Amino acid sequence: MPARRGDAHIDFARSPRPTIGVEWEFALVDAQTRDLSNEATAVIAEIGENPRVHKELLRNTVEVVSGICRTVPEAMEDLRQTLGPARRIVRDRGMELFCAGAHPFAQWTTQKLTDAPRYAELIKRTQWWGRQMLIWGVHVHVGISSPNKVMPIMTSLLNYYPHLLALSASSPWWTGVDTGYASNRAMMFQQLPTAGLPFQFQTWAEFEGFVYDQKKTGIIDHVDEVRWDIRPSPHLGTLEMRICDGVSNLHELAALVALTHCLVVDLDRRLEADESLPTMPPWHHQENKWRAARYGLDAVIILDADSNERLVTEDLDDVLNRLEPVARKLQCADELAAVADIPRHGASYQRQRRVAEEHDGDLRAVVDALVAELEI
């Protein structure tokens, strides 16, 4: 890549340890109608100044975040401490906390935007597609010690994209219609111009050059506006995994965070040992994303650059076995083992369809079931 001017440089904060942080997006639903409620501003105001609770694009959403944690159990306890008081306030106002990749029947046209310049600019630019972002997810940050590691790890992590999406898929419905997808959120979010799969850069300098070009051409004003499914967070010194659909409960959340933590640390340690990390062509990753979004746990995924294929759940078994020693060192062995519970009991998209069938298609029952899964 040609040399860039000095202002292309992006500082990376460097995390001395592979710490984790979790961002968990929740929707507010009316306790009676089970439709979305645009009351996040009032809820956040009542909670008061709290670095663990944030506003988001839409006024039906609150985001609960953990602090910087060393282990998955620590992160889950951190989230619990925030969720308990927050849910009491939400319930006192006649609402419930709800989390899935999408709401089963809400209409995007009735949702109000949060009053903030960056959100106004996003909608001004993206228009109809931006207004349709009625979606919720889970973001997991893992600390990386050097910018030189970020791009190789990010590129290799794409091999596990379908595993994480299939396990977390929780958005089969859109405005009352069964889309036929396990994760309609994955298909929706990539419509934003800076979202979707990341480019497979191998060096930090390539990423710096990309951001320079994006800023020079007016596509972004800040690096945070790069909304890839996996992206660096330079100011935090982390790699941020944004693949997962919204998760309704702490048990599955802990499992998915543990899987993410172990995958990143495993790749980091392999880099330290001068191993060459596995990669695949971008067209394989594009297909894997679509297959996982469409078929969920029934997806047959592409495994490697030689185009070998396998059922995602079969490959997941091998991944979990390989990561067991890593999980023990990271003190999340139980949480990693719980990943296997998701295929065993059914992923969220499967549970949602089951509930709808049992209630003659009444999607309010689906909301009830998802709300009930949040045990704090």
UniProtKB/Swiss-Prot annotation:
One of its GO terms (molecular function) is ATP binding. InterPro entries: GCL_type2/YbdK_subfam, GCS2, Gln_synth/guanido_kin_cat_dom, YbdK. Its EC number is 6.3.2.2. GO terms for biological process: modified amino acid biosynthetic process. It holds the Pfam family GCS2. It catalyses: L-cysteine + L-glutamate + ATP = gamma-L-glutamyl-L-cysteine + ADP + phosphate + H(+). Keywords: ATP-binding, Ligase, Nucleotide-binding. ATP-dependent carboxylate-amine ligase which exhibits weak glutamate--cysteine ligase activity. Belongs to the glutamate--cysteine ligase type 2 family. YbdK subfamily. This is Putative glutamate--cysteine ligase 2.
